[in-house]
Amino acid sequence: METATLVAISISCLLVSFTGYALYTAFGQPSEQLRDPFEEHED
């Protein structure tokens, strides 16, 4: 394969894996540890 193709595939895989990790952190099991500043603030 050409170098440009390998670089494009590598960047695409990196972007997809980062997006998957971000979604897992936001909505998966670690999201229970995140704090919500709107719930902490009382009016």
Curated annotation (Swiss-Prot):
A GO biological-process term: photosynthesis
Transmembrane spans: 5-27
Lineage: superkingdom: Eukaryota
GO cellular component terms given for this protein: chloroplast thylakoid membrane
Membrane topology: Single-pass membrane protein
Location of this chain's protein in the cell: Plastid, Chloroplast thylakoid membrane
InterPro entries, alphabetized: PSII_PsbN
Record keywords: Chloroplast, Membrane, Plastid, Thylakoid, Transmembrane, Transmembrane helix
Family that this chain belongs to: Belongs to the PsbN family.
Role of this protein: May play a role in photosystem I and II biogenesis.
Protein name per its UniProtKB record: Protein PsbN
UniProt source species: Cryptomeria japonica
